């Protein structure tokens, strides 16, 4: 229910430029950049996506010190491929005791309400995520994953993830 009240995705004013120049999609989905806590915007202008069946992802580490078991994660993304791949984009939740470099075998998938238009994909959505680790000692990560049977292509775009920690209460006028 809370999700319907988030009207826009607030991305960071500054974004990190991806240093990685190429990625090979794999069933273990390589992580594009070391995850940051609670919020991250990643810009890439010429990422070479090598041929392969699988995916790649950009993720954040969730803040588990909040007083709620569930938190909203908002995602905003605009990505374009030179080729027109048929791909699946989603949010994934997973746990790890160390900084992840690939997607582990156990993860939860959350579909997104995005829009495909040729080689372009746009999404602005939010999902309620369980932020408490199911295994003691693990950290919880949420990532934006792109999955396809890729042919070699170039990819460019922006992906922004935010853990919505502050809840804004709107008061209605008295009648």
UniProtKB/Swiss-Prot annotation:
Give the GO terms filed under biological process for this record: symbiont entry into host cell; symbiont-mediated perturbation of host process; virion attachment to host cell
Q: Does the keyword Lipid metabolism apply?
A: no
Question: Where does this polypeptide localize?
Answer: Virion; Host cytoplasm
Q: What's a single GO CC term here?
A: host cell cytoplasm
Q: Which UniProt keywords apply?
A: Capsid protein, Host cytoplasm, Host-virus interaction, Viral attachment to host cell, Viral genome ejection through host cell envelope, Viral penetration into host cytoplasm, Virion, Virus entry into host cell
**InterPro entries reported in the protein's UniProt record:** Capsid/spike_ssDNA_virus, Spike_G, Viral_coat
Q: Where does the protein principally reside?
A: virion
Protein purpose? Attaches the circulating virion to the bacterial lipopolysaccharides which serve as receptor for the virus. Determines the phage host-range. Probably triggers with protein H the injection of the phage DNA into the host cytoplasm upon conformational changes induced by the interaction with host lipopolysaccharides.
The annotated subunit structure for this chain is: Pentamerizes and interacts with H protein, F and B pentamers to form 12S pre-assembly complex. Joining of twelve 12S complex form the procapsid.
> By what name is this protein known?
Major spike protein G
């Amino acid at each position: 229910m809370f999700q319907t009240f988030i009207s826009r995705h607030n991305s960071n004013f500054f974004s990190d430029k991806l240093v990685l120049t190429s990625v090979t999609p794999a069933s273990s989905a390589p992580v594009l950049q070391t995850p940051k806590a609670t919020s991250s915007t990643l810009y890439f202008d010429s990422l070479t996506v090598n041929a392969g069946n699988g995916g790649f992802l950009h993720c954040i580490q969730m803040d588990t010190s909040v007083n709620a078991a569930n938190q909203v994660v908002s995602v905003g993304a605009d990505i374009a491929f030179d080729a027109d791949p048929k791909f699946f984009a989603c949010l994934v939740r997973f746990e790890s005791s160390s900084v992840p470099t690939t997607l582990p075998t156990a993860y939860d998938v959350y579909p997104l309400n995005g829009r495909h238009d040729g080689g372009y994909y746009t999404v602005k959505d939010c999902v309620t995520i369980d932020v408490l680790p199911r295994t003691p000692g693990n950290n919880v990560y949420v990532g934006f994953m792109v999955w396809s049977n890729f042919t070699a292509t170039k990819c460019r775009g922006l992906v922004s993830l935010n853990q919505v920690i502050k809840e804004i209460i709107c008061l209605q006028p008295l009648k």
